[in-house]
Amino acid sequence: MRDGVQCSSKVGMVSEYAPQPLRLAAWCINDSSTIQHEFLHAVGVYHTHTRSDRDEYVTIHWDNIKYRFFRDFCKRSNSLTFKTKYEPRSIMHYSWNAVALDPLEPTISLKVLVISHEEQFLMLYLSHVVI
């Protein structure tokens, strides 16, 4: 691990003979989700919103993304989905306004409503409650 001004990691093994660079700035040390996100990059996991099937689930607002971050939103044609559902709540998915030119506007918006198993159960349970 290296100290830095950002929290970042290369995706996957860089070299058999050199340490894997993992940068954790002071501001992200106390944020366990950011640390987990960067460790997952280090072991080879890409961002969820770069999946080859992402356009079925989200819209990318290119006009609101800071130019230097464009590559973080490019689809990976060879990405493996492992036949899993698209999960916008994944620790590997950017937030709705990540790296936005205008943080009040989205960089990513959902096309479909995603409901967790817990929410599905609650909805089913509530549908059977007699008031």
Regions found by a protein language model. Give the residues of each.
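Zinc-dependent metalloendopeptidases
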Residues: 1-131
